[in-house]
UniProtKB/Swiss-Prot annotation:
Its main location: cytoplasm. The record marks H353 as: Increases nucleophilicity of active site Cys. The lineage of its organism: Eukaryota, Metazoa, Chordata, Craniata, Vertebrata. GO terms for biological process: fatty acid metabolic process; lipid metabolic process. InterPro entries: Thiolase (IPR002155), Thiolase-like (IPR016039), Thiolase_AS (IPR020610), Thiolase_C (IPR020617), Thiolase_CS (IPR020613), Thiolase_N (IPR020616). This is Acetyl-CoA acetyltransferase, cytosolic. It is found in: Cytoplasm, Cytosol. Gene3D superfamilies: 3.40.47.10.
Length: 397
């Protein structure tokens, strides 16, 4: 795609906090997380719910959530029954793919205003048992839907952590290099939290507790005070034969959260007196060998930047999802990026990685960082389980 004379723009962007596994958001149904951000982005954009053409959200772990959880989130946010709502599933890239689909829908004239984003409550993902034909005798094993549907490669039957180990070996990313990336992510996020840099992008979530409703408004996954000495003591988790380098500390987390943006054409924003956060310049998606899925952002970023008519040097800020430190280091190394331009507020290693929400979460953070720093050009990108990558170029005027 190309921006054209009347580009698609983002007029508001927000996210919930990112909750730890079985943490602050664990009891909040995923559709309620979605409703929370949908309400907020519409409020910020001063768009009436009935003016929305369509709602598109990424969502991965849908088992047991009821019929069309995104439709539930849409209606729960006050959007009328007459407005369609649906989900897309591209594992880690789902939340950004939803934004791409919104851009396409608006671009061809099918929609005028779209709410796009992603949501996930990994804490509520169920264990599954196949009992349709009954169990004649013996035990019935349970399948963890997080592992089965989210974190296990279907082609090589291996955990995503093994694909990170494969990238580390092929791109010669040492354990020390990975731990340095992880500590930097934690330290940057700690600094950003203390400086209030995330405050504007976060919408508080009301959580029911024994003491009544409480307002949750601070990301709870980051570990303040992280240092290389403590991190280097952790043992590799996925390969335990002495060759492993990926640990729980240099990998992203299992998390809960939601994020959303409101999109429309520039002419529609002008008519409504809205100042866009950015315009969508280009986007790209690619496929790669699944066993090294983490390198997906490399060709995706190259393609998106080329479509935009930019060079990598033209980009002010990159938000590249930190699924694993090994992957982040390999991407920066292969593309020759300036580390000072990449994930400057920290990334998923510190903040967390709620699968279906992460694609839009990094876009929301990118938009607010560009605004706060007065920068113009940004790229959001993610690697995707199953061997894919997705990237988007945005520009502030």
């Amino acid at each position: 795609m190309n921006a054209g004379s009347d580009p698609v723009v983002i007029v508001s962007a927000a996210r919930t906090i990112i909750g730890s596994f079985n943490g602050a958001l664990a009891a909040v149904p995923v559709q309620d997380l979605g409703s929370t951000v949908i309400k907020e982005v519409l409020k910020r954009a001063t768009v009436a719910p009935e003016d929305v053409s369509e709602v598109i959200f990424g969502h991965v772990l849908a088992a047991g959530c009821g019929q069309n959880p995104v439709r539930q989130a849409s209606v729960g946010a006050g959007i009328p029954y007459s407005v369609p709502a649906w989900s897309c599933q591209m594992i880690c890239g789902s939340g950004l793919k939803a934004v791409c689909l919104a851009v396409q829908s608006i671009g061809i004239g099918d929609s005028s205003i779209v709410v796009a984003g992603g949501m996930e409550n990994m804490s509520k993902a169920p264990h599954l048992a196949y009992l349709r034909t009954g169990v004649k005798i013996g035990e019935m094993p349970l399948t963890d839907s997080i592992l089965c549907d989210g974190l296990t490669d279907a082609f090589h039957n291996c955990h995503m952590g093994i694909t990170a180990e494969n990238v580390a070996k092929k791109w010669q990313v040492s354990r020390e290099d990975q731990d340095k990336v992880a500590v930097l992510s934690q330290n940057r996020t700690e600094n950003a939290q203390k400086a209030g840099h995330f405050d504007k992008e976060i919408v508080p979530v009301l959580v029911s507790t024994r003491k009544g409703l409480i307002e949750v408004k601070t990301d709870e996954f980051p570990r303040h005070g992280s240092n290389i000495e403590a991190m280097s003591k952790l043992k590799p988790y996925f390969l335990t034969d002495g060759t492993g380098t990926v640990t729980p500390a240099n990998a992203s987390g299992i998390n809960d959260g939601a994020a959303a943006v409101v999109l429309m054409k520039k002419s529609e924003a002008d008519k409504r007196g809205l100042t866009p956060l950015a315009r969508i310049v280009s986007w790209s998606q690619v496929g790669v060998e699944p066993s090294i899925m983490g390198i997906g952002p490399i060709p995706a970023i190259k393609q998106a930047v080329t479509k935009a008519g930019w060079s990598l040097e033209d980009v002010d800020i990159f938000e590249i999802n930190e699924a694993f430190a090994a992957v982040s280091a390999a991407i920066v190394k292969e593309l020759g990026l300036n580390p000072e331009k990449v994930n400057i507020e920290g990334g998923a290693i510190a903040l967390g990685h709620p699968l279906g929400a992460s694609g839009c979460r990094i876009l929301v953070t990118l938009l607010h960082t560009l605004e706060r720093m007065g920068r113009s050009r940004g790229v959001a990108a993610l690697c995707i389980g199953g061997g894919m990558g997705i990237a988007m170029c945005v520009q502030r005027e």
